[in-house]
C-alpha cells in the first residue's frame, strides 16, 4: 500500500505530481482558483527557483506561475516514499 502525505506545492520536487486538497486564503488566491488550480485537480511541479523564487506548475493543459508565498498556501496530496 502506498502511503499518502500532504505537502505544499513549494515543498514538491520538480516533476512530482499530486492532487490539490486545500487552498489557503489570502490575496490573489481566488484568482488562482479561477485559473483552474482548485481542490481535486491534479498538479505537476514543472520548475522552481532555488530559494523563494516563482514556481511553475501544470494543471490540466495549463501552466501557471505562482509566487513562493502562494505556493506555500496550496496543500497537495502526494505518494510517500
Question: Where are the predicted features?
Answer:
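Compact, glycine-rich, soluble single-domain proteins
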Residues: 1-81
Amino acid at each position: 500500500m502506498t502511503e499518502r502525505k500532504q505537502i505544499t506545492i513549494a515543498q514538491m520536487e520538480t516533476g512530482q505530481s499530486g492532487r490539490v486538497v486545500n487552498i489557503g486564503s489570502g490575496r490573489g488566491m481566488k484568482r488562482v482558483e479561477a485559473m483552474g488550480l482548485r481542490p481535486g485537480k491534479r498538479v505537476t511541479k514543472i520548475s522552481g527557483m532555488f530559494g523563494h523564487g516563482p514556481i511553475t506548475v501544470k494543471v490540466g493543459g495549463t501552466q501557471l506561475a505562482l509566487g513562493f508565498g502562494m505556493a506555500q498556501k496550496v496543500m497537495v496530496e502526494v505518494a510517500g516514499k
